[in-house]
Amino acid sequence: MTMLGERLVLRWRVAASFAWSVILMPVCCALFIVLSRIQILHPIQWLTDSISDLTSSYTIFCLLLICAILGLQCTFLMEYYTVVPSIPCSRLALIGNLLLPHRILHSLAHVAMGVLASWCYAVLSKGKYQLLVVSCTLQSEDEADKPSHCLNESHLFQLLCGAFFGYSYSLQYFVHNMNYLSFPSIQQYKYLQFRRFLPLIIKQSVFQSLYFIRSYAILYFCLGNIPRTWIQTALNLHMDRQQPSLDTLRGFLNLSLFYQIWLSGTFLLATWYMVWILFRIYTTEARIFPVQTSFAEEAEKCLPFILNSNTLPLVKYLAMQDLVLLSQYSPSRRQEVFSLSQPGGHPHNWTSISKECLNLMSSLTSRLIAHQEAAANNGRMRVPSSPKQIRKSSSSSGTSLIEDSAEQTQNLSTIPRIGIPSLLKTASLKSSLDIGSPFATPGVKQMSESLDPNTPCHGSVQSPQVTRRGAKLWTSDSDVQKNGSEVSPVMHRPVCNGAKQGILHTWFQHKLVQIKNVLSKRGLIMYLFSKHPEASSQDVFADAQIHIWALEALSHLVAASFSEDRMGVVQTSLSSVLAILLTLQEAVEKHFKLPHASSKPARNPGSLLDSSCKTLRFSLRAALKTAIYRITTTFGEHLHAVPVSSEHKKKLQQFLDFKE
């Protein structure tokens, strides 16, 4: 599938979600007009006024403007979605993510959309909150009362409230990973999914609007005079002295205004949540990809090709989701996976699909092993590696387990070979430390006691190899030619200069440690820099959804091959499948023995916001164990004939005995 075709798949789904949002908007606007003009004592007049305003010109204009805002909302949803959630490890990292340029643009755009939406709701509600400039009468002692134009602070209050709602929604969008697309575990019709989310949308909008209004009221009470004075000066308007200012206690008692603000905020959030839910429902809808085709030009649209290509992440996730559904519910399509190519008789479909699934599981295993090694080495002294090794370790990811083990063996073999210059530098540092100097901090004294006194400055060395290299390291070429292998007396001057530099460097490092210790005792610094206990574990399994699908699809296909694979194409790779599954299972079990890895966060089933990204590691653990049991219960004792290692045979026997 070409890039243009991939974008068209996404655009058609976004267009469908936007179309349904536009269809539902007249109902939302009619409901808002009815609720904003509520008159319990005069119900007939209330209904007649509401019906007459539904067909007015300003209502249609506001409806079109709100639909345009929803179109912008869909555009931002399409540009900012992701299938892998972002897991910040600390609050400072979260703040850094929010300050990225494209996310600042998202916040500013939602501020503008919030102001426009609040203006539309103010116009739809009519009454005294409809206009920003109103007519008023100025009272003066010398002159008679004269008409003038005054600032309607209630309307300004509502516009600024819309800006606050837009910015708060944008912050929540990234803080709670609302841009993360979580695929449903159970396939349902789109109507049933939307009906299930509709009560949650209403509940979330109602209570969150109250929460936002509380925060906004406090902010306006403290800083409301700044935008009010600026607008008043820019438009050359006066203040109506007959109306109390809203940044006073008397102005806060206007319950009618707060009801209007709450109702506008509720509908603003409800429409945005509605667009967001429809976008999620349509983009995560299952799509059927052909397994094979008779035409060469359509090969790019087939499932094996998409799984092994660098396509859009969403399209690849949809392909893996289709593979899971294929492996469970479609025997005819499974036969296409097990089929052989004609001519040639090669299992290209099974090879491509199994290769991608095994690569995904191998990459996750490598990542888990690296995370466990980093956790084990946390706080320990490491042997410094060369820059080449550092670049190699930082750039390598997703390699096979055999290559990783070979590389670790090479690194371990190079550890004892410590360079001579590092030994000489340490020795010269020890000889130049003066305990009575002002730089001799307790850390320096402790270091001086722990170093070996046999250094070149003391006139003796430990190793003859160091003595042979002394002239080469510490003297010039002319000194070597004059004195031969003897060490020139001039060699002591560079040693002392290097020792002074070493003292300054050690003193500077010690001061940095002291500064860090002082800052770590500050509450605000600890609040920003303290890491979340579960963040590192959640980050390792951030993309575990596609690995869960790979496990389920591969295990279902292997289990189905026991009775459906007539050519035996799956049995040729059964040993590698079992080996990788058992290796991954061992790595996962070791990971859950780490601190905070097994602590499961509390889930709120009544919340609209999805928190499934925080529990993906538990889902993968259950899916992995289920996948192995699915294979062992299907093949039974036949697995003893599969060539695997002795450790894996013991592990398989535990699964066969249902002791795992």
Swiss-Prot record:
Asked if Iron-sulfur is a keyword of the record, the answer is no
Q: Which GO terms describe its molecular function?
A: protein-macromolecule adaptor activity
Answer yes or no on keyword Amino-acid biosynthesis. Answer: no
Q: Which residues cross the membrane?
A: 14-34, 58-78, 104-124, 155-175, 206-226, 257-277
Q: Where in the cell is it found?
A: Nucleus, Nuclear pore complex; Nucleus membrane
Name the cystine pairs: none
Give me the stretches of Low complexity compositional bias.
Answer: 385-403
User: What spans does the record annotate as topological domain Perinuclear space, numbered to this chain?
Assistant: 35-57, 125-154, 227-256
Residue intervals on the Cytoplasmic side: 1-13, 79-103, 176-205, 278-660
Q: Which family does it belong to?
A: Belongs to the NDC1 family.
Q: What does this protein do?
A: Component of the nuclear pore complex (NPC), which plays a key role in de novo assembly and insertion of NPC in the nuclear envelope. Required for NPC and nuclear envelope assembly, possibly by forming a link between the nuclear envelope membrane and soluble nucleoporins, thereby anchoring the NPC in the membrane.
Q: How is this protein named in the record?
A: Nucleoporin NDC1
What is the phylogenetic placement of the source species in the record? Eukaryota, Metazoa, Chordata, Craniata, Vertebrata
